[in-house]
Amino acid sequence: MDVIDFRHKTLSRMVRFTAALDRLLKSLPPSLAKNRLQDQLGRSGSSVGANYAESGAAESAKDFIHKLSIALKEAEETDFWLSCLCVEHPEVAEAESLHRENHEFVKILQKSISTAKRNLR
């Protein structure tokens, strides 16, 4: 698989992840804690794919790395909030599946940043 195919497939996965996360958050029972969790997780979870997409229009190699780094930070934050969701709502099976998928995004972003930095030298 070439870089463009990999990027397209990863972005498609991120779009599906964001849609699934949105559906999950809307299905949670109402509570004050849910509102905070829903807000934080919704923001960070959707930001991963948005920043990854934006990296495709980077103006330089350094800008590309910067945008991927932002996506990684958001993926790490999403990991935290998904962990909270799994603890607060262990009955929600979809949360664990999304947690695993997000962890894959963390690994992809870490490797992409590492490769881009190596190619920058």
Tell what function each PLM region has:
Residues 1-121:
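Amphipathic alpha-helical assembly/interaction segments
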